[in-house]
């Protein structure tokens, strides 16, 4: 090979190596850009933005918002619809609507007029995709494997609701504003930004979630409503839904009487409650609501009205069924109750 030929081969090799290096650099930069973009849109980043009141500097939400919160191996959809009716005569409120077992959360809005009515009355509306949740506090060893993929109420509170306290929801505490430093160096505040009154309503198993959240977090809610709910698993020991969540009664009887039994915890309820059930309900017997109301009234009489602050309104609808027609009608009645 001549000297010229060798020089040509070396030159071609160097040029090819330069092209390869350039391609690698371009690909690496593109991958880093995609990674950065993906990270900025991840659920954790979205939550960080939602929770950072110093960045947003707002009370409530400024516009309709959808975001996702991680739960185990998936992300749970959360939707906030913002009322446009809020003004001097219509104060802002929040309504959390909980779906029943295997019901789409959005059906509160697509199959009833509860959402639109609430929005017209100054309620922001919150929907959470709970899937087949039975609103338990834990994932018990006996729980069916596929049920574990759906959120507990403890997760709902800690990961979804509690983070919104910085925006004024789900809290009874205001935020001091307009600081003024006085002569002795202390800081005084001219005003207080008041919390946004928050209410919770659930249908079917969602009614369980609504009342349990109200019992466990009375500071977060001004009122609760349960439509067609089941509140005492002891009266349904053969119910497959309860067995698949809690385990068989004969094996773990204490669990059926424990923290997931609303009727046995009724003396803990501190907020006003609206109960409604259809007499023709062939899914959950109306006696579940009737017996809960009776237990509440017995507890009130035993404790005295001064020590048990909650009030409960109980409505039995003669031809009411376990369907969206009933939930739509009684959901509006519950809104009336909240505004009394």
Role assignments for model-derived ranges:
Residues 18-21, 28-340:
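Non-catalytic cap/lid and distal C-terminal segments of serine-dependent acyl enzymes
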Residues 7, 22-23:
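Short helix-onset patch at the extreme N-terminus, typifying the N->h transition
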Residues 1-12:
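Short, low-complexity, Lys/Arg-enriched N-terminal segments of secretory-pathway carbohydrate enzymes
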């Amino acid at each position: 090979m001549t000297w010229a030929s060798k020089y040509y081969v070396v030159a071609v090799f160097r040029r090819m190596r330069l092209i390869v290096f350039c391609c690698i650099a371009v690909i690496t930069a593109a991958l880093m850009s995609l990674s950065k973009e993906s990270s900025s849109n991840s659920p954790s980043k979205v939550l960080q933005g939602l929770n950072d009141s110093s960045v947003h500097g707002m009370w409530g939400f400024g516009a309709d918002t959808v975001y996702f919160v991680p739960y185990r191996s998936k992300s749970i959809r959360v939707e906030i619809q913002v009322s446009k009716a809020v003004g001097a005569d219509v104060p802002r409120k929040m309504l959390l609507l909980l779906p029943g077992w295997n019901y789409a959360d959005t059906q509160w809005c697509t199959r009833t007029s509860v959402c639109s009515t609430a929005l017209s009355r100054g309620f922001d509306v919150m929907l959470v995709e709970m899937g087949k949740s039975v609103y338990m506090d834990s994932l018990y060893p006996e729980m069916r494997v596929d049920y574990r993929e759906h959120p507990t109420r403890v997760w709902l509170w800690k990961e979804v609701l509690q983070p919104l306290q910085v925006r004024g929801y789900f809290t009874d505490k205001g935020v001091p504003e307009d600081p003024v430093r006085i002569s002795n160096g202390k800081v005084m505040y001219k005003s207080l930004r008041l919390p946004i009154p928050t209410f919770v309503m659930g249908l079917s198993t969602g009614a369980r979630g609504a009342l349990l959240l109200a019992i466990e977090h009375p500071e977060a809610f001004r009122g609760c409503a349960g439509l067609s709910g089941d509140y005492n698993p002891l009266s349904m020991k053969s119910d497959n839904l309860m067995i698949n969540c809690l385990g068989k009664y004969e094996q773990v009887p204490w669990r059926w009487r424990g923290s997931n039994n609303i009727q046995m915890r009724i003396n803990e309820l501190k907020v006003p409650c609206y109960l409604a059930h259809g007499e023709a309900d062939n899914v959950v017997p109306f006696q579940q609501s009737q017996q809960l109301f009776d237990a509440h009234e017995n507890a009130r009489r035993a404790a005295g009205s001064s020590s048990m602050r909650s009030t409960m309104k109980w409505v039995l609808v003669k031809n009411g069924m376990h369907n969206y027609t009933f939930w739509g009608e009684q959901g509006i009645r519950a809104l009336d109750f909240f505004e009394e």
